[in-house]
Amino acid sequence: MRVDLNCDLGEAFGNYSFGGDHQIIPLITSANVACGFHAGDENVMNETVKLAKAHNVAVGAHPGLPDLKGFGRRNIDISNDEIYNLMIYQLGALQGFCRIHQVKINHVKPHGALYQMGAKDREIASVIAQAVYDFDPSLVLVGLANSYLISEAKNVGLITASEVFADRRYEDDGQLVSRKESDAVITDTDEALKQVLKMVKENKVISKNNKEVTLQADTICVHGDGEHALLFVSKIREILMKEGIDIQSL
């Protein structure tokens, strides 16, 4: 049994610095690097790619909506053409830094509202998948398990990775509980570890209404901006190794 452990990183920009990227990267197998629209800038992107390479961590693009103020977590009324173009733009930006450090972009995971829009809307998911395929058909598209991001990526011929979350609660339909709700984020370490093991070993998660939901767990996400990110990543890695589960990049 194997699983990938990923984290959204490189989300500082300018004078705004947060997250424990230097401590987290050695513990994960895949880094989703912000590409400048929701967070990150040219200096942070360069440093994050360099750091990932130093620790043999797979580099992935983490493109988001153009919303620095809202950290890319607010829905924006945006056309399909704009979605396609912002995907290509951000992938190109990251590719530049990957090229100078002689590493390859391994995967793409949309961020925040863009991720949720793609998970719930087949047409948006199709646009996202097509953009990734047109940029590089060898890339892995990471999306919410059982969502349109996964099905539409498969439809265009992309390799997919179904993502599950250690630090988020689930609805009965397998969607994530909205961050607008007070119970959306898991902050208790034991609860997070219990959820992770059930998802990885049984391909199931218990929803907020105590319903058992079936899902595929190819990669586990911990949000890098979360208060408990470093602790969660450390403990998840520890318990997976204890259970004999291989932690490997996508």
Swiss-Prot record:
Gene3D superfamilies: Glycoside hydrolase/deacetylase
CDD domains linked to this entry: LamB_YcsF_like
Catalytic activity: 5-oxo-L-proline + ATP + 2 H2O = L-glutamate + ADP + phosphate + H(+)
Enzyme Commission code(s) on record: 3.5.2.9
Record GO terms (molecular function): 5-oxoprolinase (ATP-hydrolyzing) activity; ATP binding
Any one GO BP annotation for this protein: carbohydrate metabolic process
Source domain of life: Bacteria
Record keywords: ATP-binding, Hydrolase, Nucleotide-binding
Keyword Hydrolase attached: yes
InterPro entries for the chain: Glyco_hydro/deAcase_b/a-brl, LamB/YcsF/PxpA-like
Purpose of the protein: Catalyzes the cleavage of 5-oxoproline to form L-glutamate coupled to the hydrolysis of ATP to ADP and inorganic phosphate.
Quaternary structure note: Forms a complex composed of PxpA, PxpB and PxpC.
Family assignment from sequence similarity: Belongs to the LamB/PxpA family.
Protein name stated in the entry: 5-oxoprolinase subunit A
Gene that specifies this protein: pxpA
